[in-house]
């Protein structure tokens, strides 16, 4: 019988080299083909663990981009009803990060919230030096709440807010501070009085309540005179600023009374000994609330109340790598 030259003489002859590359001939008595040996178990386990780690990191990144607002009512004894319900939006440790285009995730989380003022407690720029997310946040907050006051303090990882090392750029203030000011945020360098129906609430830093005013006055005046004699515009601007906030702090302390409400902003939470060592009647001893950053926990909407009979902690999952100890107060 005539066969075409190209026709296979055996069923196995029809396998291409690509098919047979994964097989080898068996010993006589076995099957004609058998698979090559599989990868060792240890290698497969290692690959599985690496894939699991990558999946965990991806999940953590996604979770850390999720924005949720915790609402906390703070009871303050003997607070006048005029201040009842005064609400602070507390944000900290942005660290130069963006949450969606133009901080859209933060906007979505805050769009139905009502607040009277915003406090930013440090590390908003951090060592990254990227201030644009902070600027976008400030602009977005003003769009949500036109005219809302925004107060900020630096964190331990932020560039110094003022230093003569910035003088080459034409100002002794850090570029991130100048940019935030232009967008309507205020660096809290002296106590700020917030008044409702003749009753006062003070926003301050705890350090401003324990300054040796007379010693610092002498020091700042001497620095100012030296700057004038040196005719350095940046040095004059910085020393004049120091004298200004010291004078404003002195005037504020003269107005403070025992009936006022005191809220301190700080980045690193004060030590227990620092708070316990505040004697009755001292300005530091008057503090009703301390708002801190540093531990990168929740963002809070704090509502003041004189009638709150209980305290509620609102917790949420914020990723696999979060602070070791939750901070409450």
Regions found by a protein language model. Give the residues of each.
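Active-site-proximal beta-strand elements of phosphoester/diester hydrolases
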Residues: 85-95, 200-210, 263-267, 329
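Conserved beta-sheet core of the metallophosphoesterase superfamily
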Residues: 269-329
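Membrane-embedded segments
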Residues: 86-186
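Binuclear metal-dependent hydrolase catalytic cores centered on His/Asp/Glu-rich metal-binding motifs
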Residues: 162, 182-184, 197-262, 272
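Short, Asp-centered acidic motifs that coordinate Mg2+ and/or phosphate
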Residues: 117, 151, 185, 201, ...
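Acidic/histidine-rich helix-loop elements
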Residues: 61, 88-104, 124-133, 160-171, ...
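Catalytic metal-binding/acid-base residues of hydrolase active sites
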Residues: 95, 125, 157-158, 192-193, ...
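N-terminal membrane-anchoring alpha-helices
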Residues: 2-82
